[in-house]
Amino acid sequence: MAVELKETIDKRREEIMDACEKLYETKGFHSITIKDISVETSFSRPSIYNYFQTKEEIFLGLLTREYRKWNIAIAGIIGSNKKLSKDGLAKELAKSMQERKTLLKISAMNLYEIEENSRDELLVEYKRVFKESVEIFDECLKKFLEDTSKSRRQQIRYAFFPYMYGIYPYSYPTEKQISAMDEVKLSHMDVTIYDLTYQFLKLIFGL
C-alpha cells in the first residue's frame, strides 16, 4: 500500500514538473505562476501545494530530474565505450549536454532564487544528485583520459562545471540582447549548446 502511495505521489509530481518544463520553454521564470501550472495539469492550484510548497520547489525538482538524466547519459558513455580518444570523449559529452537545455537554462537564469526558496530537504536531495554528477563526470575522465592525474581531473572539473552556467545565455540570447549588441556593433555569432561544450572540452583536454 505504501509503495502504491509513493508511486502515485511520484507520478503526480512528475506531471507537475512536466507542465512546468513545458511553460518554461516559452515563458520566463517570473512569468510562470502556480495557476499557470495547474491549467497545464489535471490538478487544481490548491492540490499542487500538496506536492510542492512553492513554485521554486517545482523548478528545483525539475533541475534535480535533469541532473539525474544527465548522470544516466554519462553512465551510458562509460558503459558503452571501452576506449575513447580525447576528441571522441569531448564529442560524447557535448552530445549529453546538448540534450539538457532545461538544466542549463535553470542553472544560468534562476538557480540562486530557486535554492533560497526551497525546503532544506529538497535542496539536500538536489545537492546529492549534483554530487553524483561530479563523481560520474570524474569517473568518465578517469576511464578515458588514462594518462591524466587526479589533480588534473580536478582542474578539468573545476573549469567545466562553472563554465556550464554560461552555455545557455550564449546559445539563446534574447531579442533585446541581440538588438543591444547590434546597436553598439558588438559582434556575436549563432552557437549551439553542442558547439560551446565541444570546443571548451577540446580546449581543456589540450587539443
Language-model segment annotations:
Residues 135, 139, 143, 147, ...:
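C-terminal peripheral helix-coil segments that are non-catalytic and often amphipathic
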Residues 15, 23, 30-57, 61:
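Helix-turn-helix
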Residues 145, 149-153, 157:
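Membrane-interface starts of transmembrane alpha-helices
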Residues 99-121, 175-180:
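Amphipathic alpha-helical segments used for helix-helix packing
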Residues 9-20, 37, 62-66, 70:
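Generic hydrophobic, amphipathic alpha-helix propensity
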Residues 1-11:
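N-terminal intrinsically disordered/low-complexity leader segments
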Residues 61, 75-103, 154-160:
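Hydrophobic alpha-helical connector segments
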Residues 70, 85-104, 190-207:
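N-terminal hydrophobic signal/anchor transmembrane helix of membrane proteins
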